Amino acid sequence: MIGQPAGIIERAFELAQRSANVEEIRFQLRKEGYSNVDGHLMGRKIRADLVKVIRRVA
């Protein structure tokens, strides 16, 4: 998989390790050119999992 961009969910979890909140992750994903960011991150479970990563690193 070298050279292939990360999928949006995988990239969201990478960003969670150095983000302050989910909105910051959304902003960065849009900036990186990912589409349908809100659709991918709207679920309660995915948001809760991202917050867990953010809090664990903080």
How would you name each of these model-derived features?
Residues 17-30:
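Short, charged amphipathic recognition helices of the HTH superfamily
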